[in-house]
Amino acid sequence: MSKVAVITGTNSNLGLNIAYRLLEKIPFSEDITIVVTSRTLPRVRECIELINKFHSQLERSGSLSFDYILVDFTDMVSILNAYNTLSKKYARLDYFFVNAAQGAYSGIDWFGAVKEILVSPMKAVTNPKYKIQKVGVKSDDGMGLVFQANVFGPYYFIHKLKPLMKKGNCKVIWVSSLTAKSEYLNTNDLQLLESDMSYEASKRLVDILHYATYEELAKDGIHQYLTHPGIFTSRSFYQYLNVFTYFSMLALFYIARFCGSCWHNISGYKAANAIVHCATSDVSALDNTIKFGSATTKTGKEYVDFDKSFQCPDSEKDAVKLYFEDLRNEWDLKLKDQIKDTRKP
C-alpha cells in the first residue's frame, strides 16, 4: 500500500525541499503519494513538475504519485473542504508536515537594520527585530490572521484528520522557528492581534501547543514532533529586497556561519534536514520533548541538533490547550453543512 504524505505549503522553498528529502530518505522500494497543498492551482502544477524532476534523478523502484488540495489556512471553510477531499480519497495518512506559514509583513526598518547589524551583527541575522509587521490584522473569519494561518488553522486540520492519522500511525511534524521566544507571546493575546511580532509569537504558540497536545495524540498512535529549519533563504521576504540587499544578506549569513552559528543553513535543502529526520527515523529513536533543529558546521556539513531548553509553566500549557479546544468546538458548530469541492479554484 502506498504511503501518503501531506505537505502544507509545498510551494515554498522549504516545502519543496521537504518533499525532495523525503523521497531520498524513505526506502527506495516504497510507493508514496505526495499530496501537494497550495492556495492556487498554477502553484500546484509548478510543485508537481519540480518534485517529479527531482524524483527522476533518483534510482527508486517505488512509485511516486501526486495528489493536491487547494487550501487556505486563513479560511476555515477551505480547511473543512480540504479535509473532506482527503477523507474521501484516503483510508490513512502516514506523514503530515505543518509547514505553511504566513506573516503580516509591511517592510523593513532599514535604519533599524543597519543599527542592529553594526551593534549586534550575529543577533541581527539570527533573531532580527527590524522586520515591520502589521498589528491587528484579521482574517475574513474574524480571527487574528497570523494566529489562524500558522497555528489554529493547521491545528483544526489535524483535529479533523485524526481518524486518518490514527489508521496510518501518522507522524505529524510541526515546523516552528528559531525565533519562537517567550518574550514575543502575551498569553492574554493568543490571537496575536496586539503584537508587533506576530510571526515570532505564532511560532512560540506552536511550541506550547505541541507540548500541550503530543501526549494525547500518542494515545491514538499519532506521533507529533517539533522542529525548526534554522536560518535559510525564504521567498517570503524577497519582495522587500533588491539585488544588493539580497546578496548582502547572503554574505552576512555565511559570515555568521563561519563565526560559529550552527543555525545558518542558508539553503532550503539543509533547512529541511531535521524535519525529514523526524519523519523518517524510528519512533524509538525520537523524543517528543525536544525541539529538533537543522544545523550546519562552519564548512556547511549538515547535522541535526537538539534543543531541550523549552520552558513553560503547566498552567500556561493547559490554558493554551483549553483555549484551542474551545475555539475548535466553536468552529465545529459554525462549519456544519459548509463542505464544498476543493478542486474548484
Regions found by a protein language model. Give the residues of each.
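NAD(P)H-dependent oxidoreductase Rossmann-fold/reductase module
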Residues: 1-81, 85-94, 103, 171, ...
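Conserved NAD(P)H cofactor-binding loop of Rossmann-fold oxidoreductase domains
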Residues: 97-134
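A hydrophobic alpha-helix adjacent to the NAD(P)-binding/active-site core of NAD(P)-dependent oxidoreductases
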Residues: 135, 146-147
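Juxtamembrane membrane-interface segments at transmembrane-helix boundaries in membrane proteins
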Residues: 136-140
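A short, exposed helix-loop element centered on a Lys and neighboring polar residues
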Residues: 158-159, 211
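Helix-to-beta-strand junctions that scaffold the AdoMet/dcAdoMet cofactor pocket
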Residues: 165-168
